[in-house]
Design a protein with these regions (language model features):
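A cross-kingdom marker for long, charged
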Residues: 197-240
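C-terminal motif of bacterial Sec signal peptides marking the signal peptidase cleavage site
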Residues: 15-18
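Residue-level signature of catalytic and energy-coupling elements of molecular machines
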Residues: 51, 127, 223
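An amphipathic alpha-helical core segment
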Residues: 153, 157-205
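N-terminal Sec/ER secretory leader and immediately downstream segment
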Residues: 22-105
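Non-transmembrane, aqueous-exposed alpha-helical and coiled segments at domain scale
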Residues: 21-38, 136, 210, 216, ...
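Mid-length scaffold segments of soluble, non-membrane domains
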Residues: 95-165
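Sec-dependent signal peptide recognition
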Residues: 3-9
C-alpha cells in the first residue's frame, strides 16, 4: 500500500515538473514570436515613458514645472564626483557647489524629450533573437536586454546633447569658475579642465536603467498596468 502511494506521489511530481518545463512551449503555441516581440516592446515603451516622466521634464509647453525630478530624489540625484569638490567645500564654497549640482541636475532633466525620442525610435525597431526567453527571463529581463544592446548608443546620444543644456543653464561657466577657485587654493594649474560631461552621463544612464527596471517589474506583476485585457500586452503577460 505504501509503495503504491509513493509511486502515485512520484507520478504527480513528474507530471507537475513536466508541465512546468512545457510552460515556455505553451506560450509559443499561443503566440508567435512577432506577437511576443510586440508585447515586449509595449512593455518597454510603457516602462520608458514612466521613467522619463519620473526623472525628466518631457514637455513643459504652457505647463508649470512642479518638480525637479533627478534632483528631487536622492536615489537618482546626480552629484559631482570630481576630486576637487572636497577641497572646494573645505574652503568655504559649499553654496557654490550646491548651486552647480542643482543646475547640473536641471540640465539632465531637460534632456527628457531627447531621451524619449531616442527610446521611441529604438523600441519601435527592437527585435529579440529569442523573445520567449526575454518574456520568461525575470522581472527586469527587458531592461537588461536593452541595457546590453543599446546602452552605448544611449550614452552617445546624451554625450552629444547634454552640452547644449549645460550651455543654456550656465553649467560650463559655473564649473569653470569653481575650477579656477580650486587652482587658486591648491596652486595646481592643470593644463586640462576636469571633465564633467562623462560622469554626469554615466549617472544619468545608471539612474535611468535603475528606474526602468522598477517600472518594468511593476508592469509585469500588476495586471492593471498591462492595459486593455483584450490587448496583446495583457494577453501575453497574463501567461507568466
Amino acid at each position: 500500500m505504501e509503495k503504491r502511494i509513493y509511486l502515485l506521489l512520484l507520478s504527480v511530481v513528474f507530471i507537475f515538473s513536466a508541465c512546468r518545463d512545457k510552460s515556455d512551449e505553451f506560450v509559443e503555441q499561443l503566440f508567435t514570436d512577432s506577437q511576443i516581440t510586440a508585447a515586449l516592446n509595449q512593455c518597454a515603451d510603457s516602462a520608458v515613458m514612466k521613467t522619463c516622466n519620473a526623472l525628466c521634464i518631457v514637455d513643459t509647453a504652457g505647463e508649470e514645472i512642479l518638480g525637479y525630478y533627478f534632483f528631487d530624489s536622492k536615489s537618482y540625484r546626480i552629484d559631482l564626483v570630481n576630486q576637487i569638490v572636497d577641497t572646494l567645500v573645505a574652503n568655504g564654497y559649499q553654496d557654490q557647489v550646491d548651486s552647480l549640482i542643482f543646475i547640473l541636475n536641471r540640465a539632465a532633466e531637460q534632456c527628457g524629450e531627447k531621451i524619449s525620442q531616442f527610446w521611441a525610435s529604438t523600441i519601435k525597431n527592437m527585435t529579440y533573437p529569442k523573445p520567449n526567453l526575454v518574456l520568461h527571463g525575470g522581472n527586469n529581463a527587458i531592461t537588461e536586454y536593452l541595457k546590453t544592446a543599446k546602452q552605448s548608443e544611449f550614452v552617445a546620444t546624451l554625450v552629444a546633447y547634454l552640452p547644449v543644456q549645460f550651455t543654456a543653464l550656465n553649467v560650463d561657466s559655473t564649473w569653470s569658475q569653481l575650477q579656477y577657485k580650486y587652482f587658486e587654493i591648491t596652486g595646481n594649474y592643470s593644463p586640462a579642465p576636469f571633465g564633467i560631461i562623462t560622469p554626469t552621463v554615466e549617472q544619468m544612464v545608471t539612474g535611468f536603467f535603475k528606474k526602468m527596471a522598477i517600472e518594468e517589474a511593476a508592469i509585469r506583476t500588476t495586471s492593471a498596468l498591462q492595459g486593455n485585457p483584450n490587448g496583446l500586452l495583457y494577453r501575453v503577460f497574463s501567461t507568466l
